[in-house]
Each structure stands twice: as structure tokens, then as C-alpha cells.
Amino acid sequence: MRWPPWSSKTQEPTIADDKQQNCTSLLPVTTNQTDKAAILDWAAFTELRTLIPTLILTTAILSAARFHRSYLRRFPDAPSIDAAYFRRRSIYGKVTSVGDGDNFRIFHTPGGRLAGWELLPWKRIPKGKKELRDNTIHVRLAGIDAPELAHFGRPEQPYAREAHEWLTSYLLSRRVRAYLHRPDQYQRVVATVYVRRVLDFPIPFRRRDVSYEMLRRGLATVYEAKSGAEFGGDAIEAKYRNAEWWAKLKGNGMWKGFRRNKEFESPREYKTRVGLEEKK
């Protein structure tokens, strides 16, 4: 019986209705309802307001990864250098040691100071031999042969020490750019190397070809091996030979009085002679 008696049917208590709603909420969702919800969820991913930011973010991540791999990836030593770099790319780094008159080691610093090298705490260049071990690239200067220092029981050539001392003073602790030609059999990279110096008269910061500078000072000869010679092009080879010719004419370095010295021996002749003697 309704109470009060004058109340309408629409004003009846809804206890039964509430029970029915509660039971309905406990029933499992039908397949049609699930499919409909899934369709609604996927539709959100196809909207422009979702697609455009996602596309921008993905492109940015992939571009950053490619840029890092191409320009900011550091090579710890010569064997680790990607083959795609040879004859196409260069590396930038700081010279940590000079082993001979025509080879030295650099710590690869891709991007240089712009990438934070020697500015950020986690991009410091090691100084100790232990930290630098297996962490530097061994570079062989392209296109030249310097007199040999005494090693492996072999005697020292005339002007070997002068060539080594000059190269050390010219490059040690300086930043250089090496244009890579190829690896050699001694786990080095043959490269044309350039350096910029602040106190370079008459033009400061002028880019200098290290091999060329050694040739014109008479501290090296043009590389004369029958195979494996690397110059970086015919124009550079001609430039090197011209520099050697003038050094001979002026009597610079090792060429001083070489015409009168019957015992004069070029670095290539020295290596050939010593190699034949060791085979005996």
C-alpha cells in the first residue's frame, strides 16, 4: 500500500529498482561493450592532436641518435674507427704523446669544446699513462718519412732526434684535425693532420699541414715506399715534392751538405738496409 495514499506511482519507493541496478552492475560486460570500448580507445591514437606530437617526438629521438652516431661518437683507439670514416671523414682530438718523428697519439674529442670537452666534469681528458692506455688513437703522418729513432736494437738515424723534438714541440697538448686515409699493419691510422696555433706569424690560427711543415724544414722526406703511400690526392703529393725540392736546394735540416756526404741515407733507404740485414 502506498503511503501517503495520495502519492502517484512515480513517487513509489525505488528499493526494488536499486536492487535491480546493483545486480546489473555485477553482470559481466558483454563482448559488444568491450569491442566498443576498444574502438573508442584506438580512435584517440588516430587523432591529429595525438599523432603530431608523437611524430615530432619520434623524429627528434631518431635524429638525435643519428647525429650522435655521426658526429659525437668517440673512438677509443685506431681499430675501433668505423670503416665509413676512411677517405670520407676526419677526427678531432688532443695530442697526448709523440712517439717518433712521424707518428703520435691523440685522445679523440668529437665536437671539441662545443660538445663540452675539457669544460664538463665528465668530459675531462685523462693525463696519466694508466688512464690513457688503450684510450688513444695512434696516428701516422701521411706522405712523409722521418728519420728513425733508436728502437728494437736499431741505431738512430741522423736528424731523428731533431725531427722528434720539433714534432713534440709543435703538436704535444695541442688540438689537431686528422683526415683519415686508411689503417696500417701496426694498428695506426694514416692521416693528413692539420693544426692551428695562436702564435702563428704572420696569420694567427692559420691551419697548417704538419707533414708539409716537416718537409720544408728538412725534417722528413716524401714517402717513397713502392706500396702503401698515402698523400690525400695528386695535388697534395705535388705540393709535398715541391717542398722537399726547396728544402734540398736550401740545405734545410737533413739536407745540409747531403750531396757531399757519401754516407747520407734517407729514411726509406735506412729501412730497406736494416730490413735486409735482419733477414740474414
Swiss-Prot record:
Belongs to the LCL3 family. Residues 89-257 form the TNase-like domain. It is a single-pass membrane protein. The active site is at R140, E148, R188. InterPro entries: SNase_OB-fold_sf, Staphylococal_nuclease_OB-fold. The gene is lcl3. It is an enzyme of class 3 (hydrolase). It is found in: Mitochondrion; Membrane. Its main location: mitochondrion. Ca(2+) binds at D145. Its EC number is 3.1.-.-. The keyword Ubl conjugation does not apply. This is Probable endonuclease lcl3. Pfam families: SNase. Keywords: Calcium, Endonuclease, Hydrolase, Membrane, Metal-binding, Mitochondrion, Nuclease, Transmembrane, Transmembrane helix. Gene3D superfamilies: 2.40.50.90. One of its GO terms (cellular component) is membrane. One of its GO terms (molecular function) is endonuclease activity. The chain crosses the membrane at residues 50-67. It comes from the Eukaryota. It comes from Emericella nidulans (strain FGSC A4 / ATCC 38163 / CBS 112.46 / NRRL 194 / M139). SMART domains: SNc.
